[in-house]
C-alpha cells in the first residue's frame, strides 16, 4: 500500500504500497519486534508527506520512566514535528491516516502476511504458510483458505485467532468505514471487485472470499497484508462508526513488545517494554531474494521458516526489542527537531521527507553523527480537480503539463537536490517504468518560448478561445498572457484559483514548484495563486468526501509500497475521494478501470507489469496528476544507537519508522 509519504507516514500521500500502502505501516504480527517484517497498506496506502505543523511549540524531551526490571533498559529517543491525531488504529486508517499518527501508533493489529526489509520479501506473519492458490467456489467467488499459527496472543492474554480477521472485516463492512479501510479491506459488491466475506473456518483457519479471482494486488499484497484487530477489546465499541473511532486506545491490546506508556497530547508520547510480552528475540537472515527467520524464545510459538531464494550472500541479525522505553518528543518544526538532535536530546528524527541537503551536509561535520542516504520509493505531485472547471478540461491539464519546465526548476532553482519524475513508478523499479508519452514527451527539451507556444496550441486545438492570445517575447522573459479566455463550452475560468502546497518550512521543493507553476499558469491566462498551507489542512481539504469539489489544485506526495499497485488506488473511478477513496482528482476513465481490473487479477508479476504500462500511457494522456519529482532520502542518527541495517529503499523512517523494535542503544 502507499501512504502519504509514506509507510507509517504522511497521509497516504504513504501508499505504503499496495493496499499495502505505506499508508499503513508494519502489520506484521511481529510488529515492533521483528520490525524487519512489515505489512504494507496505502498505504496503498494515502499517501508521502509529513504534515506541516504550526501550533505545537518546541518542547523539552520527555522524561523517561524506569524500564520494567525484567525487560531491557535504555531509552530510544526520537523527534517528531507534527502532532499525531489519534492513538486509535481504527481512526488512524479511517480519516487520520497521516504519517505522524502512524509513527506513534502502537502495534494494535496483526496480519496474515508481512514484508521483510530491507529486501522487500513477502513472508508470513500470523499465517503459518503462504497460500498463493485460490479455490473457485463455482458461484462467481474465489477463496483463499489460510492456516494461522496457533499460540500467538494479544498483550491482554487473549489468543490471536481467525475470529479477529472475520470480525474486523465485518466491522469495516457493517460500519462503512472509509479512508484506508477501503483499500486494505475493499468490500466487494455488484459494481466493485473486492472481498465479500471473511470466515473463521475454525479458531486457526481463516477463509477470505473475493467476488473475483484476486491476483497479486488483491491477495498477497492486498487482503493478506490487511490488519486484524482484537475482537475481545474493540467489540464493545463497534456499535457505530463514531463510537468506534472515538474509543480509548491507550490500553488497547497489542501484538508487540511495546505498549503505550505516557501520552501527552501536544508534547510527547512514550512506549514501554511489556515484561509479559512474547514478541521478542529470534534471528533474521536476509538474502538478495529471500529471508529466513528462526524464533524460539520459549514463550511464543517456535518458528523456523524461509521465503524466496535463500542463496547467495546474506547477513543475519538478532531481533529485539533491546530498549525499555521508546520516546517520541514533539517539536514545532523541522528546524527545532534537528536542533534538538544536534544538542543530543534525541537519537533520531522521524522525517518522511528526509533532511534538506544543506542540513545533511552541515550535520556530516558534527561529531557523533552517522549518515544514511537511500533511494526514495515515493513521489511529489500536483493534482487537478477534474470534477470542476477548468481542471475538468483535458486540454487545460495538458497545456499546464507542457509549460511546466521541471528540469529548469530542479537544476537552476533547487540546485539539483531533486530528481525529475514523469510517471507513477520510481526509476528504481526499472521493469515497471513505462516510456514517457503524450505532451510530456512532446514538450521535453523545449525552450520557455516553445513551451508557451505549444501550450497555447494545445488550448486552441481543444476548443478554447481568447479575445487576444498574447505572445512570448523569447528568452527568459515572461509571456504576455492571453486575455478573455473561454473554455470549449464558452465558460470563463474562475478568478483567484488557489494552488495549495506545503510551505517552505515544511517542504521547500513543493513550495518552490508551486510558485513557478502558478506563474506559468498565469502566463497562459489563468488566475492561479500559490497558497502555502499546512500539510494537515491540505489533507483535510482534498481527502474528505464533503470537500471533494472545494479545491482546484494541490501539491502533496506519496510514499509507495512494496508492490506498485498504487495507480489503481489513486485513479480507478470507484476509488473517488467523494466516496471515501484516494482518487482525489476524480479521474473517471472506463478504459483505465478495465485495465485496473485486469491488473488486480494478474497472478504473474510480468503480466502485472505489462498492464501497468498500459495504465500509465492513459495517465500520461489524461494527466489527472502532474508528477513532479522524487528525492533521495537523507537521514542521520547519533552514534550511540545502532540499527541491524541502514541500506533500504525509502530509508529508516519510511520502512521501519526508526525501527524501535530492533534498535540498540549503546551505553
Predicted regions and their residues:
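N-terminal lobe/hinge region of extracytoplasmic solute-binding protein
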Residues: 77-139, 253, 414
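Gly/Pro-rich hinge or "lid" segments in bacterial periplasmic/extracellular proteins
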Residues: 106, 116-121, 224-327, 335, ...
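Surface-exposed binding/hinge segments that line
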Residues: 70, 77, 145, 182-247, ...
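Ligand/substrate-recognition segments at binding pockets and active sites
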Residues: 78, 265-267, 332-333, 446, ...
Amino acid at each position: 500500500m502507499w501512504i502519504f509519504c509514506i509507510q507509517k507516514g504522511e497521509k497516504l500521500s504513504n501508499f505504503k504500497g499496495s493496499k499495502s500502502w505505506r499508508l499503513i505501516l508494519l502489520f506484521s504480527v511481529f510488529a515492533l519486534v521483528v520490525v524487519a517484517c512489515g505489512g504494507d497498506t496505502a498505504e496503498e496506502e494515502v499517501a508521502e508527506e509529513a504534515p506541516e505543523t504550526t501550533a505545537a511549540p518546541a518542547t523539552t524531551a520527555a522524561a523517561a520512566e524506569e524500564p520494567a526490571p525484567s525487560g531491557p533498559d535504555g531509552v530510544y529517543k526520537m523527534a517528531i514535528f507534527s502532532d499525531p491525531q489519534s492513538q486509535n488504529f481504527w481512526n488512524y486508517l479511517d480519516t487520520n491516516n497521516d504519517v505522524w499518527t502512524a509513527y506513534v501508533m502502537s502495534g494494535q493489529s496483526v496480519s496474515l502476511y508481512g514484508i521483510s526489509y530491507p529486501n522487500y520479501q513477502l513472508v508470513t506473519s500470523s499465517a503459518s504458510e503462504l497460500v498463493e492458490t485460490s479455490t473457485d467456489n463455482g458461484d462467481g467467488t474465489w477463496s483463499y483458505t489460510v492456516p494461522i499459527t496457533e499460540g500467538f496472543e494479544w498483550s491482554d492474554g487473549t489468543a490471536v485467532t481467525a475470529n479477529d480477521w472475520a470480525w474486523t472485516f465485518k466491522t469495516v463492512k457493517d460500519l462503512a468505514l472509509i479512508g484506508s479501510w477501503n483499500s486494505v479491506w475493499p468490500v466487494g459488491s455488484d459494481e466493485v471487485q473486492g472481498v465479500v466475506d471473511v470466515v473463521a473456518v475454525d479458531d486457526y483457519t481463516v477463509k477470505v472470499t473475493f467476488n473475483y479471482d484476486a491476483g497479486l494486488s488483491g491477495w498477497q499484497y492486498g487482503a493478506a497484508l490487511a490488519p486484524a484487530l482484537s475482537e475481545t477489546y474493540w467489540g464493545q465499541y463497534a456499535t457505530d462508526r463514531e463510537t468506534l473511532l472515538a474509543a480509548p486506545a491507550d490500553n488497547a491490546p497489542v501484538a508487540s513488545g511495546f505498549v503505550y506508556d505516557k501520552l501527552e497530547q501536544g508534547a510527547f508520547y512514550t512506549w514501554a517494554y511489556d515484561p509479559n510480552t512474547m514478541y521478542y528475540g529470534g534471528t533474521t537472515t536476509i538474502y538478495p531474494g529471500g529471508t529466513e527467520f528462526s524464533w524460539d524464545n520459549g514463550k511464543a510459538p517456535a518458528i523456523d521458516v524461509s521465503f524466496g531464494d535463500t542463496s547467495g550472500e546474506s547477513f543475519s541479525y538478532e531481533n529485539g526489542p533491546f530498549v525499555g522505553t521508546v520516546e517520541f518528543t514533539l517539536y514545532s518544526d523541522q528546524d527545532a527537531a534537528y536542533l534538538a538532535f544536534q544538542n543530543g536530546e534525541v537519537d533520531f528524527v522521524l522525517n518522511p521527507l528526509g533532511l534538506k541537503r544543506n542540513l545533511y551536509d552541515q550535520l556530516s561535520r558534527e561529531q557523533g553523527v552517522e549518515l544514511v542516504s537511500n533511494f526514495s520509493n515515493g513521489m511529489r505531485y500536483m493534482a487537478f480537480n477534474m470534477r470542476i472547471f477548468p481542471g475538468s478540461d483535458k486540454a487545460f491539464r495538458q497545456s499546464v503539463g507542457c509549460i511546466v519546465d521541471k528540469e529548469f526548476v530542479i537544476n537552476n532553482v533547487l540546485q539539483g537536490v531533486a530528481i525529475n519524475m514523469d510517471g507513477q513508478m520510481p526509476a528504481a523499479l526499472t521493469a515497471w517504468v513505462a516510456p514517457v508519452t503524450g505532451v510530456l514527451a512532446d514538450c521535453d527539451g523545449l525552450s520557455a518560448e516553445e513551451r508557451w507556444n505549444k501550450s497555447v496550441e494545445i488550448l486552441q486545438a481543444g476548443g478554447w478561445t481568447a479575445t487576444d492570445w498574447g505572445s512570448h517575447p523569447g528568452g527568459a522573459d515572461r509571456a504576455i498572457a492571453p486575455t478573455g479566455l473561454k473554455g470549449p463550452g464558452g465558460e470563463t475560468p474562475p478568478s483567484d484559483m488557489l494552488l495549495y502546497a506545503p510551505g517552505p518550512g515544511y517542504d521547500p521543493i513543493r513550495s518552490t514548484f508551486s510558485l513557478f507553476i502558478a506563474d506559468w499558469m498565469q502566463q497562459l491566462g489563468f488566475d492561479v495563486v500559490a497558497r502555502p498551507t499546512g500539510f494537515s489542512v491540505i489533507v483535510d481539504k482534498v481527502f474528505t468526501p464533503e470537500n471533494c469539489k472545494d479545491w482546484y489544485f494541490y501539491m502533496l506526495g506519496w510514499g509507495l509500497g512494496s508492490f506498485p499497485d498504487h495507480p489503481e488506488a489513486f485513479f480507478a473511478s470507484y476509488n473517488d475521494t467523494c466516496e471515501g477513496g484516494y482518487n482525489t482528482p476524480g479521474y473517471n476513465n472506463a478504459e483505465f478501470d478495465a485495465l485496473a481490473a485486469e491488473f488486480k487479477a494478474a497472478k504473474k508479476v510480468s503480466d502485472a507489469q505489462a498492464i501497468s504500462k498500459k495504465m500509465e500511457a492513459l495517465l500520461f494522456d489524461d494527466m489527472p496528476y502532474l508528477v513532479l519529482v522524487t528525492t533521495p532520502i537523507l537521514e542521520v542518527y547519533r552514534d550511540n544507537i545502532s540499527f541491524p541495517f541502514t541500506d533500504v529503499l525509502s530509508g529508516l523512517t519510511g520502512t521501519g519508522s526508526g525501527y524501535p523494535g530492533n534498535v540498540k542503544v549503546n551505553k
